[in-house]
């Protein structure tokens, strides 16, 4: 719109300077204000029965009694908290309060360019834990019964396998799992749950938001749990869910 406005203004200004027109009609044209609404994009989320299937896979065991998928409980934890992948990777066991049933989110793992002694960028990136990008990213998220169970199950598995790490996300040697490794865990869980839809870790966050909104949790509360900068971000992202909730509400109104 800005480009078209500029080109037309220049065109009419030239015509005015040449005497072809009395005045530039674009002179008093004002640009429209930016709208808060973004073009609607498709949000993929798991259905309730698919979430139940993930939970069942997380507790599956091999014949030797060990879990079928070591880190499957991380997937269950994500779908019940809505944390970003980087926030999960930066999470310490000390961030979990089992008494108050909350998790404190104040860190984020991101991939940054590594540099040599001269300050030049190297071809590879390294993982670095930083504070959350925004103030709203620092938050306390409540843990439901299933999120608590997933963490306790994971801690038990770590103990049985001799994994000793302050990190909630840890490999067999105690190192942090990468995004790709977590994505592979998700793919394995989806396979055993017989869910064929293409799915990413971030869509577990969408699933959490969708299910909480459908359950009737106020959007302001959901926005706070997700760590969004403001409630309009939540509204614009999940407007389709809110429209569905409104439709259900209208149906209930008819029953009064």
Could you say what each language-model-derived stretch is?
Residues 90-96, 223-229, 239:
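A short, basic/aromatic helix-end/turn motif that makes direct DNA contacts
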Residues 56-68, 81, 141, 156-167, ...:
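Short, basic (Lys/Arg/His-rich) helix/loop patches that form interaction surfaces
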Residues 9-12, 16, 242, 246:
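C-terminal flanking helix
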Residues 2, 17, 21-23, 27-91, ...:
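Basic, Lys/Arg- and aromatic-enriched nucleic-acid-binding interface segment
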Residues 109, 226-251:
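Catalytic-site neighborhood detector that most strongly recognizes the C-terminal catalytic loop/helix
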Residues 28-31, 50, 91-156:
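Conserved tyrosine-mediated DNA breakage-rejoining catalytic core shared by Y-recombinases
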Residues 1-14, 29, 143:
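Non-catalytic DNA-binding core/recognition domains of DNA-processing enzymes
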């Amino acid at each position: 719109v800005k480009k078209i406005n500029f080109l037309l203004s220049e065109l009419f200004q030239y015509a005015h300077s040449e005497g072809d027109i009395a005045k530039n009609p674009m002179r008093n044209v004002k640009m429209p204000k930016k709208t808060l609404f973004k073009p609607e994009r498709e949000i993929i989320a798991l259905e309730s029965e698919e979430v139940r299937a993930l939970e069942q896979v997380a507790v599956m065991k091999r014949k030797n009694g060990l879990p079928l998928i070591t880190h499957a409980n991380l997937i269950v934890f994500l779908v019940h908290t809505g944390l970003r992948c980087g926030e999960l990777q930066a999470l310490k066991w000390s961030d979990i309060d089992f008494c108050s049933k909350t998790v404190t989110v104040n860190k984020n793992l991101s991939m940054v360019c590594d540099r040599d002694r001269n300050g030049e960028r190297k071809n590879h990136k390294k993982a670095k834990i930083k504070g959350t990008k925004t103030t709203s990213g620092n938050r306390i998220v409540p843990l439901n019964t299933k999120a608590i169970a997933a963490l306790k199950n994971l801690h038990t598995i770590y103990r049985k396998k001799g994994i000793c790490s302050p990190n909630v996300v840890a490999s067999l040697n105690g190192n942090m799992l990468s995004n790709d490794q977590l994505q592979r865990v998700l793919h394995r869980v989806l396979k055993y749950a017989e869910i064929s839809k293409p799915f990413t870790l971030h869509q577990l966050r969408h699933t959490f938001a969708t299910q909480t909104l459908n359950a009737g949790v106020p959007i302001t509360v959901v926005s706070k749990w997700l760590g969004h900068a403001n409630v309009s971000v939540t509204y614009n992202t999940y407007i389709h869910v809110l429209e569905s909730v409104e439709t259900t509400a209208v149906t209930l109104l008819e029953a009064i």
